[in-house]
C-alpha cells in the first residue's frame, strides 16, 4: 500500500510542473501567430508600445540610452556609413530607434 501511495505522490508531483495554456472565448476575429501556434484568436490585448513621447529619455543605472537618430538598427549593425557617429558607443542602457 505504501508503494502505491508513494508512486501516486511521485506521479502527481511530476505532472505538477506542466504549463497549461487556455483560451478565453469571445467574439474576436483577430488572429495572431504565437511561438507555439499559428492563427490563435485574440481574446484580450494590452497596448505595450508607446504612441506619445515627451522627447527625453531616462538613464538606467547611470547609463544613458543610445539614440540611433536617422540610422536604423540594421544599418548600425551592418556598418551603414550614415551610422558612423555611433561606432564609438560601447555601453548603453537601451536603444532608441526613431520611426522613419
UniProtKB/Swiss-Prot annotation:
The keyword Protein biosynthesis does not apply. One of its GO terms (molecular function) is host cell surface receptor binding. GO terms for biological process: clathrin-dependent endocytosis of virus by host cell; fusion of virus membrane with host endosome membrane; fusion of virus membrane with host plasma membrane; virion attachment to host cell. It comes from the Viruses. Residues 1-16 form the signal peptide. In natural infection, inactive HA is matured into HA1 and HA2 outside the cell by one or more trypsin-like, arginine-specific endoprotease secreted by the bronchial epithelial cells. One identified protease that may be involved in this process is secreted in lungs by club cells. Its main location: virion. Major glycoprotein, comprises over 80% of the envelope proteins present in virus particle. The extent of infection into host organism is determined by HA. Influenza viruses bud from the apical surface of polarized epithelial cells (e.g. bronchial epithelial cells) into lumen of lungs and are therefore usually pneumotropic. The reason is that HA is cleaved by tryptase clara which is restricted to lungs. However, HAs of H5 and H7 pantropic avian viruses subtypes can be cleaved by furin and subtilisin-type enzymes, allowing the virus to grow in other organs than lungs. Binds to sialic acid-containing receptors on the cell surface, bringing about the attachment of the virus particle to the cell. This attachment induces virion internalization of about two third of the virus particles through clathrin-dependent endocytosis and about one third through a clathrin- and caveolin-independent pathway. Plays a major role in the determination of host range restriction and virulence. Class I viral fusion protein. Belongs to the influenza viruses hemagglutinin family. This is Hemagglutinin. It comes from Influenza A virus (strain A/Duck/New York/12/1978 H11N6).
Amino acid at each position: 500500500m505504501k508503494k502505491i501511495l508513494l508512486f501516486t505522490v511521485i506521479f502527481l508531483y511530476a505532472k505538477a510542473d506542466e504549463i497549461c495554456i487556455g483560451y478565453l472565448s469571445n467574439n474576436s476575429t483577430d488572429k495572431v501567430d504565437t511561438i507555439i501556434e499559428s492563427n490563435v484568436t485574440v481574446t484580450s490585448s494590452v497596448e505595450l508600445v508607446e504612441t506619445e513621447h515627451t522627447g527625453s529619455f531616462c538613464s538606467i543605472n547611470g547609463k544613458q540610452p543610445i539614440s540611433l537618430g536617422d540610422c536604423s538598427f540594421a544599418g548600425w549593425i551592418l556598418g551603414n556609413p550614415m551610422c558612423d557617429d555611433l561606432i564609438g558607443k560601447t555601453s548603453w542602457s537601451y536603444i532608441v530607434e526613431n520611426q522613419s
